[in-house]
Amino acid sequence: MAMTVHCDIVSAEGEIFSGLVEMVVAHGNLGDLGIAPGHAPLITNLKPGPITLTKQGGAQEVFYISGGFLEVQPNMVKVLADTVQRATDLDEAQAQEALKAAENALNLKGADFDYSAAAARLAEAAAQLRTVQQMRKGK
């Protein structure tokens, strides 16, 4: 039997996952982080993108978070997400449309253009698409 660590994924709306996992992969500020049982303690920011859980037995479950924090202790991993969705609940067509709209907004800058807001919308839409693609790859 593989070693496991307890993982909780929560947001302001509530807990979306709580259980034992063999591995957690999340998108941090400096790239992807792989967290296995016994990992050194760590707290880090998370960027928008997928979080992949490898459950007992090897089954994978993918979530999308819009950002947040990751806390790692030797026997516990906690994801505190701004917002979180199961990847299966994401609408790929809607994410592609949001990506196009954000790209258009960046190209059609007006006098009252908010570059940081447009860039954030673009990053979030791209992260949602990346999550859907990662979920498909895992199946």
From Swiss-Prot:
Please give the PANTHER family that the UniProt record associates with this protein: ATP SYNTHASE DELTA/EPSILON CHAIN, ATP SYNTHASE EPSILON CHAIN, CHLOROPLASTIC
Q: Which HAMAP family match?
A: ATP_synth_epsil_bac
Query: Keyword set for this entry?
Result: ATP synthesis, Cell inner membrane, Cell membrane, CF(1), Hydrogen ion transport, Ion transport, Membrane, Transport
- What family does the Swiss-Prot or TrEMBL record give for this protein? Belongs to the ATPase epsilon chain family.
UniProt membrane topology term: Peripheral membrane protein
Subcellular localization, as worded in the UniProt entry: Cell inner membrane
Q: Which InterPro entries match?
A: ATP_F1_dsu/esu_C_sf (IPR036794), ATP_synth_F1_dsu/esu (IPR001469), ATP_synth_F1_dsu/esu_N (IPR020546), ATP_synth_F1_esu_C (IPR020547), ATPsynth_dsu/esu_N (IPR036771)
**Cellular component per GO, a single term:** proton-transporting ATP synthase complex
Spell out the Gene3D superfamilies in the cross-references: ATP synthase delta/epsilon subunit, C-terminal domain, F0F1 ATP synthase delta/epsilon subunit, N-terminal
Q: What does this protein do?
A: Produces ATP from ADP in the presence of a proton gradient across the membrane.
Q: Which gene encodes it?
A: atpC
GO molecular function (one): proton-transporting ATP synthase activity, rotational mechanism
Subcellular location, principal: membrane
> Domain of life here?
Bacteria
By what name is this protein known?
Answer: ATP synthase epsilon chain
Q: Which organism is it from?
A: Pseudomonas putida (strain ATCC 700007 / DSM 6899 / JCM 31910 / BCRC 17059 / LMG 24140 / F1)
* Subunit: F-type ATPases have 2 components, CF(1) - the catalytic core - and CF(0) - the membrane proton channel. CF(1) has five subunits: alpha(3), beta(3), gamma(1), delta(1), epsilon(1). CF(0) has three main subunits: a, b and c.
